[in-house]
């Protein structure tokens, strides 16, 4: 399953398939790194962070053939903590990885609503539906039912709408429809006492990104206000964050991810799970574009932020994935 099926636009990754590539040789290096006293973490990083996911899976197959052992099991027994988390993330195909991340966000202590928003708001229809299938196969319950059971109110309705994966993905703009939708959004929010959340939900969830950009332009022409400011005034909490994420992704998904990375490292502490998820999942898609946007917006390279903020072993893996 190719990344192009999830993101059908030309993007710049930072991780490319290794060439030349010998999975048997790589398996031998990993075996040596984990055999005997101690573990050679650097050798593990140099192999797994410099191969594409398809190659990593070929290495795992060669490892089992050569040594009669499961590579994932050996990695789990040798590694620990967040370093184990990032290495296992590298060994997980994208649909399963996102399914696991969603399950963790739903079933952990409290609900990680920002992770749910980030994943569901940035995937194509195909991506959402594929991940929903893997989720049900892996956990025995539908993604929709788990979201319903763990969220409430307007945010629950937003999640249920998103997980249907029914956004219009046709190209082209209908200007008359954009004007009508802009008026409907205004009437549902700033133009009345109280807010009709369902109108915002319906329009933001179903219209194509190209159409939404025209709607936002027409909204500003109509009201004199940016749609993001209107959402901030009319909503609060998780549903506000969800609607804003849709708007930001519509304007620039690259900028949205660069902002998420910055927020994961800014202030006290590091949101390691967010940092790992974005770096690993985007490394073979568009991390090259994201790191350029990060540099332009924050005046400092993504690599330098990671080096200063992340723990040593995790930081080395993530910097390796981020480097060209």
Curated annotation (Swiss-Prot):
It comes from the Eukaryota. One of its GO terms (molecular function) is phosphatidylserine binding. Pfam families: Annexin. The keyword DNA damage does not apply. InterPro entries: Annexin, Annexin_repeat, Annexin_repeat_CS, Annexin_sf. Transmembrane segments: none annotated. The keyword Transferase does not apply. GO terms for cellular component: cell cortex; cytoplasm; endomembrane system; nucleus; plasma membrane; vesicle membrane. Keywords: Annexin, Calcium, Calcium/phospholipid-binding, Repeat. GO terms for biological process: endosome transport via multivesicular body sorting pathway; maintenance of cell polarity; wing disc dorsal/ventral pattern formation. Annexin repeats lie at residues 21-92, 93-164, 176-248, 252-323. PANTHER family: ANNEXIN (PTHR10502), ANNEXIN B9 (PTHR10502:SF233). Belongs to the annexin family. A pair of annexin repeats may form one binding site for calcium and phospholipid. This is Annexin B9. It comes from Drosophila melanogaster. The lineage of its organism: Eukaryota, Metazoa, Ecdysozoa, Arthropoda, Hexapoda.
